[in-house]
Amino acid sequence: LKLKEKYKYKRKVFIKNLILNVFIGIHNFEKKKKQRVRFNIEVITNPYIKPNNKDLSTILNYEDLINKIKLLVKKQHYELIEDLAENMFEIIFQNRLVKKINIKIEKLDIIKNSESVGIEFSKSKI
């Protein structure tokens, strides 16, 4: 069901400060011990598809998304944050509603005297 296009409309699903223990990094010590990694994810979805509680294909389920990310980081060691982000993009874009994704991935506790270091990524459908 499409909403009437009287307004410019935007819908964003977000996950804020999800912290998971992840095998990530190029250094030998990073390959032996999981690190705390913080994820902040924003997903812009098609705002003109009306959410329907009887048809969950009309929404992006954030609980499902979190579970997929948890599974992704459990499966392997990531040498680079960039590789992890690309795999996250691939999973999130499987949902037909997704138009744009912003991901911020931060390694916590890795650099002395720093709360975190990381990278922000943005990808959108053309």
Name the predicted role of every residue range.
Residues 1-126:
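N-terminal, polar/charged subdomain of small-to-medium soluble alpha/beta proteins
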